[in-house]
Amino acid sequence: MKALRTVSALALTLLLLQPIPVSANMAAPQDPDVGSSITFQRSDALAVTEEVLDITVTGSTAQITAAYTMTNITQEAVSTPVMFLAPNTGDGSVEVTLDGEALSWSVDQYALSFDSKVETEDWRYAVLTADGERTFSEELVDAITFQLDFDPGETSEVKVSYPYRLGGYPDYDWNAKRGVIYYYLTPAALWQDFQSLTINLYLDKDMPVIKDSSVPFEKVGTRTYQYTSDTLPQEDLSIFIDENVVQETIGFFRSPYTRMLFAFLLPPVLVVVALIVILIIILKKIRKHKNKSHL
C-alpha cells in the first residue's frame, strides 16, 4: 500500500502542477541589407568586362567585396561619377579602391521601408519611399558615389567592399535560424561588353547550406559555393542559407515552442504512466489475494 500511496501522490501533484500554456509569437523576419552592382554615367565610354563578387558569411553578417574589370574603350580620357548601394557606411567599413589605391567617396542616405523600391534616375539607382520621409521603424540605405578617371584605352580594377547584415532569423539559436542575402544585379544592365560573372559564396559553420537561390551555385569546397556565367542573370541575386539536417534536429529541441509543447504534454503523459503503474499494482494485489484465497 505504501507504493500505491506514493504513486497516487505523485500523479496528483503532477496534475495540480500542470502548466497553463503561454502563447508565443515569432518576431517578423529581419529585412536583409541592400547592396548593388555599380552604375556610372559614362557607360558609353567605359566597359565592364568582368565582375567577381565575393560574399563571406560570418554569423549574422557578411562581407561583400565586388571587383570590376573596367576598360576605357575610347581614344580619349574619361572621367565619370560612379555609384552603388551599400549599408553600414557609418562605421567606416566601406572601402573603394582603384588598382589597390583607396579612393574617396561620398554618401547619400535614403529611407528603406516595406514599400521601398529601386528606381533609376538617369544612370543612378536610388532607393525611394512613398513619401520620402523616414519613420521611426525604417532603416536607411546608403548610396555611395565616387569619381573614376581613365586614360585612353586604360584597363583597371575597381573594388568595393562593405559589411552586410543578413535578413531572416540569422541570430536565432534554434531551428528557425536562417539567413537571407539580397543583391541588386539589375543596375548592371547598363554595362556594355560584359563577358564574365563569378560569384563566390563562403558560408560559416552556423548556416552551411544553401536552401534556395536565384542562380545555380556549385559546391567547390567545404561550405564554399560558386556561380560562373558569361552573361548577367535576368534577375537580382537572392540567396537563402540554412542549417544542415543535424543542426536542424538539435535546434528543434532548443526551440522555445518545443520546450513549451513538452512542458504542456509531459505532465499528462506522466499522469497516464502513473495511472498505469497504479493499475498494475492493483492487479498484482488482486491476483495475489486470489491466489491466497485458493490455498
For each predicted feature, which ranges?
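Bacterial N-terminal signal peptides
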Residues: A9-Q18
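Solvent-exposed beta-hairpin/edge-strand motifs
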Residues: M83-E119, L190-S213
